[in-house]
Swiss-Prot record:
Chain's role: Converts the preformed base xanthine, a product of nucleic acid breakdown, to xanthosine 5'-monophosphate (XMP), so it can be reused for RNA or DNA synthesis.
UniProt keyword Lipid biosynthesis present: no
Location(s) in or outside the cell: Cytoplasm
Protein known as: Xanthine phosphoribosyltransferase
Pathway in which this enzyme or protein is active: Purine metabolism; XMP biosynthesis via salvage pathway; XMP from xanthine: step 1/1
Subunit and interaction comment: Homodimer.
Domain of life of the organism encoding this protein: Bacteria
Gene3D superfamilies: 3.40.50.2020
Residues binding 5-phospho-alpha-D-ribose 1-diphosphate, per UniProt: A128, N129, G130, K131, A132
Length: 190
């Protein structure tokens, strides 16, 4: 998606050969026009897949997921990372490790919102080693729902996430595929 790549080139900051900072438009400050375009693109790619729910993880996956949900006309569920007084019974949970934050957390979704009748599109801001995606897949599998695929805003293709997910049989659609962050420069695949 050229609009996204242009934004990464102009506003992304390479912090190391493994970390890309995009807080100017995606995971701190949000560019709503770009998010709308991202939602449209995910909807275009998954429109014919019978999606009934979109599942993401808080917090940075919420904006692109909501825009895709708006375009597809389906609800969005975000897995919570933090305990809540209102979210405590009948939970589907998984443990995930955050590459960026270097911390493990338990994510949770209420069984009220996800069932075996659902066909799910997973959306997330980044795909690196695939830990968050695998956690969401675990939760969706616990519910007995089916997975149409994964929509990723930015994929770090030099890490193993995509390969592992595809080898497990999942469809991965990434809007920007980063081949390298070497020498402080973003290099894209395609």
């Amino acid at each position: 998606m050229e609009q996204l790549k242009d934004k990464i080139r102009s506003h992304g900051i390479v912090l190391s050969d493994r970390v890309l900072k995009v807080d100017a438009f995606l995971n701190h400050q949000i560019d709503p026009v770009l998010m709308q375009a991202i939602g449209r693109e995910f909807a275009r790619r998954f429109r014919d897949d019978g999606i009934t729910k979109i599942v993401t993880i808080e917090a940075s996956g919420i904006a692109p997921a909501v825009m895709a949900g708006l375009e597809l006309g389906v609800p969005v569920i975000f897995a919570r990372k933090h305990q809540s007084l209102t979210l405590h019974d009948n939970l589907l949970t998984a443990t995930v490790y955050s590459f960026t934050k270097q911390v493990e957390s338990t994510i949770a979704v209420s069984t009220q919102h996800l069932s075996a009748n659902d066909r799910v599109l997973i959306i997330d801001d980044f795909l690196a080693n695939g830990k968050a995606a695998k956690g969401l897949i675990s939760i969706i599998n616990q519910a007995g729902a089916s997975i149409a695929g994964l929509g990723i805003v930015i994929e770090k293709s030099f890490q193993t996430g995509r390969k592992e997910l595809e080898e497990a049989g999942y469809r991965v659609e990434s809007l920007a595929r980063v081949a390298s962050l070497a020498d402080g420069a973003v290099q894209f695949i395609d």
